[in-house]
């Protein structure tokens, strides 16, 4: 068994993952898996690294603990490039588990092992974007965009541009976000990339809702493929669009259907109940539910949801003369802006509405 050949397979698989070439990636993994006696060869540690990469990249429901234990036994023979790949995949596993601090720790390790790879920078920008560290996210987006162009990794480039659009959206630069999203939407249609199309249309529904552009919101919502219509955010946006459009009968039907089917998301359940209370002219109950939504979003580090809820609370506090609460919302929105320039974790801020 030529260990060097399997080491090159590790590099090939990581490169195919970077370029989003899933079919070729899985063919390469299958070739390795079908190699006779590889688990007992000098390349056995690379073999288990490839099994680990397969499990995480393809999000398979397997226990990866055994793979990692074996890899740890043999990682001292890995090249620095293999080590950087290993730690980046460990970071990706933690990202899927929403264990952000641990993911950042593994990315730092990957970077230490000569790991200035596109995907490591891409993972940094994704995490910082989720946490609301917008200056840091922007730095890594710019760096990753340059690397993607240099490496001709155009499929990955589109996802980086999507991140740029999301950053515009999070920082209330909606015109810039919409302009970029529409360009990416056209590209996704040309490429017949349904997942990219769904991501972009979802964001366009969100920006339309924020801007109360009801017609555009429904237009984008109706263009999303049926396979994605179970998305709870999209269902929630639909109810909200009916409410903004004064289609109260449809809004009530939408809310009733949502509450019958929502199970595991307290955020969505509280948001829809708040909307129902607004329609039932029970503003104080609506406010209480929105405040619960805010705390849930904050706890989960979901910046976009937290800001969206604050916008609803801002209008309600203003309408019902709750000046102390209104002042607090302004402070929270300012703190979110300041937070984007600071090195702190969103869960540690401890912002309270009461």
Set out the residue ranges of the language-model regions.
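Helix-turn-helix repeat elements of alpha-solenoid scaffolds
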Residues: 17-31, 56-71, 92-108, 131-142, ...
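Loop-centered beta-sheet repeat module
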Residues: 134, 138-203
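Residue signature of alpha-solenoid helical repeat architecture, marking inter-repeat boundaries
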Residues: 3, 41-44, 79-81, 115, ...
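Residue register of alpha-helical TPR repeats
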Residues: 7, 46, 85, 119, ...
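Amphipathic alpha-helical segments of tetratricopeptide repeats
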Residues: 29-36, 68-76, 104-113, 142-153, ...
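Flexible inter-repeat linkers and adjacent short helices
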Residues: 1-90, 102, 107, 255, ...
């Amino acid at each position: 068994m030529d260990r060097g050949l399997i080491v090159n397979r590790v590099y090939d698989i990581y490169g195919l993952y970077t370029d989003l070439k899933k079919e070729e990636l899985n063919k390469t993994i299958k070739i390795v898996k079908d190699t006779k006696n590889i688990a007992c060869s000098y390349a056995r540690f690379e073999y288990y690294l490839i099994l680990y990469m397969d499990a995480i990249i393809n999000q398979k429901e397997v226990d990866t603990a055994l793979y990692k234990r074996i890899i740890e036994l043999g990682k001292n023979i890995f090249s620095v490039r293999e080590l950087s790949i290993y730690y980046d995949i460990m970071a990706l596993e933690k990202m899927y588990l929403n264990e952000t601090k641990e993911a950042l720790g593994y990315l730092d390790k990957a970077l230490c092992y000569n790991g200035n790879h596109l995907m490591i920078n891409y993972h940094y920008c994704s995490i910082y974007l989720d946490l609301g560290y917008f200056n840091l996210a922007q730095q890594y987006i710019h760096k990753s965009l340059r690397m993607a162009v240099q490496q001709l990794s155009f499929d990955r480039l589109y996802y980086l541009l999507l991140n740029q659009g999301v950053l515009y959206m999070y920082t209330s630069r909606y015109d810039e976000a919409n302009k970029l999203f529409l360009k990416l939407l056209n590209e996704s249609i040309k490429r017949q990339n349904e997942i990219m199309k769904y991501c972009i249309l979802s964001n366009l529904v969100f920006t339309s809702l924020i801007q109360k552009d009801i017609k555009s919101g429904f237009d984008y919502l109706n263009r999303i493929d049926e396979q994605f219509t179970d998305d709870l955010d999209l269902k929630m946006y639909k109810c909200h669009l009916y409410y903004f459009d004064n289609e109260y009968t449809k809004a009530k039907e939408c809310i009733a259907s949502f509450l019958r089917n929502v199970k595991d998301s307290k955020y969505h359940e509280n948001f829809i109940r708040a909307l129902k209370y607004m329609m039932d002219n029970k503003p104080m109950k609506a406010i209480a539910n929105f405040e619960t939504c805010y705390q849930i979003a904050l706890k989960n580090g979901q910046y976009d949801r937290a800001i969206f809820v604050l916008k609803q609370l801002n209008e309600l506090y203003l309408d019902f003369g709750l000046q102390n609460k209104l002042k607090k919302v302004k402070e929270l929105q300012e703190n979110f802006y300041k937070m984007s320039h600071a090195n702190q974790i969103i869960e540690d801020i401890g912002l309270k509405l009461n």
